[in-house]
Amino acid sequence: MTGFDAFKNFEKDGWEERASTYGNWAVTSQIVPVAVEALNLSSNDNVLELASGPGYGTSEISKKTKNVLGTDFAKSMVVEAKTLFPNLNFEQADAENLKFEDNSFDKVFCTFGILHFAHPDKAINEVRRVLKSGGIFVFTVWASVQESPFFGILSEVISKLGSFDVGLPDGPPIDDF
């Protein structure tokens, strides 16, 4: 494996294992309605969600347009989303290598997914490619340790009582965005 391939496999395997329990953690889904508003949707918009997980964002988007596709690189997340939202469209896709034609979507949406991509720059280039001219890309990320009291406290506790070196594969910097 080269570069961040080990990180990509680690992330994919982790999300495959957590698909059925991810919905129990309502932390990230709380931002979905606010982030969807930022898309400024109209009823005829064609929307792509990346890293859709169990489909909460896709479901919220579907309230404003029926042309929405949720995607995730973890097959079990796609299965979970289809179970929770059987009337919506989901498919497995790699955000870093999308199979869609250029200029296919009016809007692209991704909540807290970018930090799980081994090559976020590739994913953003793919968004640029599949997004129509004048389209909108809305994404969310966690605030940096310096800006987030929660992550600051967590970082301080780990530094004092443990170690950040827990054998995780190298990945892109978590606060690049």
Give names to the regions the model predicted:
Residues 1-45, 56-60, 77-80, 84, ...:
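Conserved class I S-adenosyl-L-methionine
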Residues 107-120, 143:
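A short SAM/SAH-binding and catalytic strip from SAM-dependent methyltransferases
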Residues 46, 135-136:
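Short glycine-centered segments of the SAM/dcSAM-binding site in methyltransferase folds
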Residues 122, 128, 136-177:
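Conserved catalytic/acceptor-binding region of the Class I
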Residues 117-118, 131-133:
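Helix-to-beta-strand junctions that scaffold the AdoMet/dcAdoMet cofactor pocket
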Residues 48-98, 122:
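Class I SAM-dependent methyltransferase SAM/SAH-binding core
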Residues 96-108:
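A short acidic, Gly/Pro-enriched loop at the edge of an enzyme's catalytic core
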